[in-house]
Curated annotation (Swiss-Prot):
Its main location: nucleus. SUPFAM superfamilies: Homeodomain-like. Residues 245-262, 415-431 have a biased composition (Basic and acidic residues). It is found in: Nucleus. The lineage of its organism: Eukaryota, Metazoa, Chordata, Craniata, Vertebrata. This is Iroquois-class homeodomain protein irx-1. Acts partially redundantly with other irx members in neural patterning. Required for formation of the posterior forebrain, midbrain, hindbrain, and to a lesser extent, spinal cord. Acts early in neural plate development to induce expression of some but not all proneural genes, and specify a neural precursor state. Also up-regulates repressors that prevent neuronal differentiation. Patterns the neuroectoderm in both the anterior/posterior and dorsal/ventral axes. One of its GO terms (biological process) is negative regulation of BMP signaling pathway. It comes from the Eukaryota. One of its GO terms (cellular component) is nucleus. Keywords: Activator, Developmental protein, Differentiation, DNA-binding, Homeobox, Neurogenesis, Nucleus, Repressor, Transcription, Transcription regulation. Residues 126-188 bind DNA. Belongs to the TALE/IRO homeobox family. InterPro entries: HD, Homeobox_CS, Homeodomain-like_sf, Iroquois_homeo, KN_HD.
């Protein structure tokens, strides 16, 4: 076998030499010499020439594959490099400079400008490319502005038209008109009304309202506007605004001070203690309620039970319960008000808690004694005997209050001899506004409680057999 396409000839026989004789003439000669040598060997008489020729043929046949290894082999099964095929005829050279069309096909148009690859939308030579505002481009804008001096606000459609004519962007056109309007205001002091909203709504302008609201927010043309004057105007406006704010603050402080003074000043309640002044914020001047004792000898002022105001919620939450229930010293002025029972004496219908030491009195209801019946409040309200006991206690307290006042006055007259002078005697004849103190000794309260308990026990003992 031989592979002449790859250039590797092998040992050939006589039959094979005929096959490849037309392709390889050198191989054919070597094959003929080898055949002659074989015939001579078969005859049995080899000669020296035959031996030399046979050895030469063997060496030639062996070295035939190395005879011309680099002699331009013709690979008919593959594409040749020397001849240009019609498939790649339109392709240029692969190793040319980039200034040439390169490997691009001839049908594709290469860049006309060598070495320029645009990143933007337009090229340098494109007439649609936007450019800076010049005198030629702004002449159209000036002409439109002269025609519309009364209303120098172009609509969205007019801006688009002017931008196409002047080859500018919409932002450039809007900025130019804003600066032009500012120049007109400063030079000619021209004032014009607000632009019509109908034209703006037709084209759906979304940025034009900003120019209408405030012209000072637009861009400023530094070449045509005096910056110092603008700064002075801004300073004057800021000073005026600060003065107005100060005036508003002062007026608000005066109004708040008046309201506080109206709340703090009492109408005709006489002398008040600090507790009553603190409670005065919660009450109005005309809604003071008083409680008349059963004896009718004195008036007890009670803090009103109206709706608390907002600023007093913190005080009511933090103040103890005793401060709200304590009543200030009453005055001797007679106020005709209907008798109102104190809320502590009113019957309540809630469940009450008991002390831990008296818990057995609540649980062991079958073993209640007479004293526990007196001191125990029912689960549905106040015991009627308890109400009578409280009324009797307050009646005796008010009857003994003038006696205590006279005793105190006699003691004070003994200690101060100046009170007997005529100057002080005149003052003593005047009606006093001071009220007798409501402080009661503790032993009186204990004695009264024992008396009232004995009366209550007698009433309960008389009521039990009847039941």
């Amino acid at each position: 076998m031989s592979f002449p396409q790859l250039g590797y000839p092998q040992y050939l026989s006589a039959g094979q030499a005929a096959v490849y004789g037309g392709e390889r003439p050198g191989v054919l000669a070597a094959a003929a010499a080898a055949a002659a040598a074989a015939a001579a060997a078969g005859s049995g008489r080899p000669t020296g020439a035959d031996l030399g020729s046979s050895s030469t043929a063997a060496v030639t046949s062996v070295l035939g594959m190395y005879a011309s290894p680099y002699s331009a082999p013709n690979y008919s099964a593959f594409l040749p490099y020397t001849t240009d095929l019609t498939l790649f005829s339109q392709m240029g050279s692969q190793y040319e400079l980039k200034d040439n069309p390169g490997v691009h096909p001839a049908t594709f148009a290469a860049h006309t400008t060598p070495g320029y690859y645009p990143y933007g939308q337009f090229q340098y030579g494109d007439p649609g490319r936007p450019k800076n505002a010049t005198r030629e481009s702004t002449s159209t804008l000036k002409a439109w502005l002269n025609e519309h001096r009364k209303n120098p606000y172009p609509t969205k459609g007019e801006k688009i038209m002017l931008a196409i004519i002047t080859k500018m962007t919409l932002t450039q056109v809007s900025t130019w008109f804003a600066n032009a309007r500012r120049r007109l205001k400063k030079e000619n002091k021209v004032t014009w009304g607000a632009r019509s909203k109908e034209d703006d709504n037709i084209f759906g302008s979304d940025t034009e309202g900003d120019h209408e609201k405030n012209e000072d927010d637009e861009e400023i043309d530094l070449e045509s506007i005096d910056i110092d004057k603008i700064d002075d105007n801004d300073g004057e406006q800021s000073n005026e605004e600060e003065d107005e704010k100060l005036e508003h603050l002062r007026q608000g402080e005066k109004e708040s001070f008046k309201k506080e003074s109206e709340v703090m000043i009492p109408s005709s309640d006489g002398l008040k203690s600090k507790d009553s002044l603190s409670l005065g914020k919660e009450s109005s001047d005309t809604s003071n309620t008083r409680i008349v004792s059963p004896g009718g000898q004195g008036n007890i002022q009670v803090p009103p039970h109206n709706k608390p105001k907002i600023w007093s919620l913190a005080e009511t939450a933090t103040s103890p319960d005793g401060a709200l229930k304590s009543s200030p010293p009453p005055s001797q002025a007679n106020h005709t008000s209907p008798p109102i029972q104190h809320p502590a004496f009113l019957p309540s219908h809630g469940l009450y808690t008991c002390q831990i030491g008296k818990f057995h009195n609540w649980t062991n209801g079958a073993f209640l004694t007479q004293s526990s019946l007196i001191n125990m409040r029912s689960l549905l309200g106040v015991n009627p005997h308890h109400v009578a006991h409280h009324n009797h206690h307050h009646l005796q307290a008010h009857q003994q209050a003038p006696l205590l006042a006279t005793n105190l006055s006699s003691l004070s007259s003994d200690k101060t001899p100046e009170r007997t002078s005529p100057k002080h005697s005149d003052r003593e004849n005047l009606p006093r506004t001071e009220s007798p103190p409501q402080l009661k000794p503790s032993f009186q309260a204990v004695r009264e409680n024992t008396l009232s308990q004995q009366e209550g026990t007698s009433r309960i003992l008389t009521a039990l057999p009847s039941a």
